[in-house]
Amino acid sequence: MMKKITRRSFLSICGAAAAAAALTACGGAASSTAASSAAASSTAASASSTAALSGNVATGGSTSMKNVIAALTEGFAEIEPDVTISYDPTGSGAGITSAADKTLDIGLSSRALKADETGVTGTIVALDGIAIIVNKDSKVEDLTVDQLKQMFTGEITNWSEVGGDDGEIVLVGREAGSGTRDGFESIVDVKDSCKYAQELTATGAVISAVEANPLAIGYASLSAIGDTVKAVTVGGVECSEETVKDGSYEVQRPFVFVTNDSVTLSAQAQAFFDFAASTDAADLIRTAGAVPVNE
């Protein structure tokens, strides 16, 4: 099951406590022993409800979500400094499986859940454009989805066929099980039919391989792209926050928090989940290079 949070107020408990304190103050005119006892109880309850959280929140999965998780972790630490967020970059498939088998509090996936991935719920916290990257010296500036399909399946093998210099196209992709690979292949309709020259285990490795080879083409998360490679337009549309959010850029996918349907999250895990899915996290997500869904 997939869902998209529109807004959560993870500090609602604090608001409730403040309201309770205000009501207690209004009733302070009655100075009986019973009133004093009630006020003391209210104060204790308020202190308990706003007590700082502690403990660990175990997350893991998508390697493409590394920058987003790092930013969210840093922002959350300003609110709950005694909570530790761990992150194990094992790939989207492993993240979903680990949420299902209760190994992780929150699994991370850079693709939507599949029909057979049951017992868990996916919550979209951000969107990510999958940038099509070429070497900075390449003359190619734009490719269509159909051209990408033909290139990655081996129907088009020379750069001259798509406006580049003469030279055999070198296809660089991610390893099987990668959420980025799954997203790219699903969107471009090349599932399990790509003729990769290299299958690499991390987004950074793909970027480095394309940077080093003037004949290479690959794909990588928008949030990870720097100035060492060139992102081509797809169908004339640049891969950017605006085009991902408005849907005009075709090669995009969600960043998903995956939780187990049969487990109640710990207080600290729920607080981190709510923070990540709230408007308070929008600037952090944007700083990490992804597109926030809640603003």
Model-derived regions: residue spans:
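N-terminal export leaders
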Residues: 7-11
